[in-house]
Amino acid sequence: MFEKTGIASREMVMSVFPSIERINKGPVAVVECYQKIPCNPCETACPAGAIRVGDDINNIPARDEDRCTGCGRCVAKCPGLSIMIVDGSKSAKTVEFRIPYEFLPLPQAGETVVGLDRAGQPICEARVVRVTNPPAFDRTPVVTVEVDRAYLYDFRNIRTEA
């Protein structure tokens, strides 16, 4: 089905998600890259060496959740917008996601936005915590949102109402 729709199945999502124990320790990357393509900016961006593509640039990136510091440098560098950071250490009821967001207008901190699943369907409300857009991100802002834990494996993006 993925080949026709581009929408990852639950099994695919779970295969790339860090363990819940790691998520609860602090920020960690989720690399939702499911196809072999010639790409490695995530590997070169990672200062901890936690994302590896290897000698063949077509390899699917592998993330070492123990080495990942959750710095987020990989998020804005991924041309496929396939990486997000998840952090479950701040609350028992919510998780924070840092996602690439290349739409205008950018949301503002404190704003409530619509949380979307991988098919682009509304699933929840999300509270914008911050928006980061330094020149080093090369016009790929990263939006941090807080989402109810019930949507940990379903949340993928946001929609503003503007």
Segments (PLM) and residue ranges:
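Local cysteine-cluster metal-coordination motifs and their immediate loop/turn environment
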Residues: 37-49, 66-81
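Ferredoxin-like iron-sulfur electron-transfer modules
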Residues: 16-38, 51-70, 87-103
